[in-house]
Amino acid sequence: MAQKEGGRTVPCCSRPKVAALTAGTLLLLTAIGAASWAIVAVLLRSDQEPLYPVQVSSADARLMVFDKTEGTWRLLCSSRSNARVAGLSCEEMGFLRALTHSELDVRTAGANGTSGFFCVDEGRLPHTQRLLEVISVCDCPRGRFLAAICQDCGRRKLPVDRIVGGRDTSLGRWPWQVSLRYDGAHLCGGSLLSGDWVLTAAHCFPERNRVLSRWRVFAGAVAQASPHGLQLGVQAVVYHGGYLPFRDPNSEENSNDIALVHLSSPLPLTEYIQPVCLPAAGQALVDGKICTVTGWGNTQYYGQQAGVLQEARVPIISNDVCNGADFYGNQIKPKMFCAGYPEGGIDACQGDSGGPFVCEDSISRTPRWRLCGIVSWGTGCALAQKPGVYTKVSDFREWIFQAIKTHSEASGMVTQL
């Protein structure tokens, strides 16, 4: 169990506090149960989680949008803006990008359970980040509709055993987890969004750690000493311009603790290296949902880093509770959230920062893991009423998409608001 004497609140990486998990006894798992996701617009199913209102067919890649007024699924009528619509649709579902798109004809491909069409308002399309805001029911006289293949994410390629809390994990279980190393030493965790982009915490890159040629990204292994993992260099780091400690070293405001790392070349996607999904647009966390945090950080506050990747399941705590006087006393801002047990015992610690907090759902029919949080900061490790604090990824979806599109050719340290 991670322990700390005293109560100073510090970033998880204050001496690079990067994602590592502390072992402890899991209590209350059964009592807490698995809470469901709250979705802005959904199709309720009696036996499963709500479906997200934008779907892509696994059979022929057709895009389908739910008409909540009529209670039916509709196809997207093909237009001159198919590339933009395909990309926006994939992003809305939590995929990083559309890989390809095409047209299908309803007369030959069939309706396959859908009923009618939506058309896109192409004039409004450049000014929106939500497909649902720019579509309306239409006739689609040509009967041609849009299909898209989104970059796959959030799925393991190997069968794995279930492990509960604060223990060594197995190869391929969390294939999006990477280690960010500076001069060969593990400093932070990170999550693969694609073969060449990693999402992590901004505080992993203070002034003293900004020589990019000294950074390496290690992937495809669970043991830090494994000879089988892959290491790649870093081309650029894009960090949030609103992360105040980079402007004022005395600032204790930890909002906007998020950064993207662009690799010097793409990692090959294998059974052990896979990207994680982002939250879908409008998808919100529900208090009490039990999710998983992983990392190689310290197993105790004053202890050593874990040699093998650790994992632990912890519940999300409401911001109202976490801002209470006995917890963090109004330090939890809207773009943060807490996760852990009030009694402590299981938590992220130094060496865990920047690492993934992931939750599984079935809102896209296929079960997928989504990156809901980034290990950010906390008081000590695994202390009672001092749970880990995470950057809320759902509030940074548009920042992520824009940063990747804007800075794909950049090099060095780059800032983006």
Curated annotation (Swiss-Prot):
A Pfam family assignment: Hepsin-SRCR
EC number: 3.4.21.106
Record GO cellular component, one term: apical plasma membrane
Expression sites by tissue: Detected in liver and kidney.
Transmembrane feature ranges: 24-44
Top-level EC class as recorded in UniProt: hydrolase
Domain spans labelled SRCR: 54-151
Highest rank taxon of the organism: Eukaryota
Organism phylogeny: Eukaryota, Metazoa, Chordata, Craniata, Vertebrata
GO terms for MF: peptidase activity; serine-type endopeptidase activity; serine-type exopeptidase activity; serine-type peptidase activity
Cysteines engaged in disulfide bonds, as pairs: 77-140, 90-150, 119-138, 153-277, 188-204, 291-359, 322-338, 349-381
Summary of the function given for this chain in its UniProt record: Serine protease that cleaves extracellular substrates, and contributes to the proteolytic processing of growth factors, such as HGF and MST1/HGFL. Plays a role in cell growth and maintenance of cell morphology. Plays a role in the proteolytic processing of ACE2. Mediates the proteolytic cleavage of urinary UMOD that is required for UMOD polymerization.
Topological domain spans for side Extracellular: 45-417
Membrane-topology descriptor: Single-pass type II membrane protein
Protein family according to the UniProt entry: Belongs to the peptidase S1 family.
Species, as recorded: Homo sapiens
Protein name: Serine protease hepsin
Leader peptide range in chain numbering: none
Gene designation: HPN
Cross-referenced PROSITE patterns: TRYPSIN_DOM (PS50240), TRYPSIN_HIS (PS00134), TRYPSIN_SER (PS00135)
